[in-house]
A protein has these predicted regions:
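A cross-family "folded-core" feature that marks the main globular domain of proteins
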Residues: 1-157
């Protein structure tokens, strides 16, 4: 017996168009696990998330699963401070990684949580992902200056 879709969310404009296209091109199991992860985020986050995350996170999950299955590794050094900059979101992202591991029986490195964290932050803000990367890069530069000038690591404080 097929499962009946029970969740409702509203996308408008470009996000709606992107989601409609994505549904045609994305395996249903990626969409379903993405919805489970987003439901977890919404239940455990102290901040509201816009529904655009259904498009961006599902697309990210699909690309991540395919990349891992093809054995393609990704350099995440530019995202090392995401954990300390967005602590709450990072914890949610780690749980999402565990959900993906369980759903797809793949080894997914915890570092992938950095990208998922940025998707959560993007959904909390009205900014786009490029602005989030820029903000994160600036904050990492500030952290480096503080570390070099005062020998104080603010990452874990």
């Amino acid at each position: 017996q097929a499962e009946k879709a029970e969740k409702k969310f509203e996308l408008k404009g470009e996000a709606k168009h992107k989601f409609e296209k994505m549904i045609q091109d994305t395996p249903i199991d990626y969409i379903l696990v993405s919805e489970e992860i987003i439901a977890y985020f919404k239940e455990h986050s102290t901040k509201a998330l816009n529904d655009g995350i259904y498009v961006t996170l599902t697309d990210h999950i699909a690309n991540t699963i395919e990349r891992i299955r093809m054995g393609i590794d990704f350099d995440m050094t530019m995202l090392l401070n995401v954990k300390s900059l967005y602590r709450e979101e990072y914890k949610l992202a780690l749980h999402a990684i565990e959900m993906l591991r369980n759903a797809f029986h793949l080894h997914i490195d915890d570092n992938e949580a950095n990208f998922i964290t940025l998707h959560i932050v993007n959904a909390e803000l009205t900014s786009n992902m490029m602005e989030i990367y820029t903000i994160t890069s600036i904050l990492e530069s500030i952290n480096t200056i503080v570390l070099q000038s005062f020998q104080v690591d603010v990452q874990d404080n």
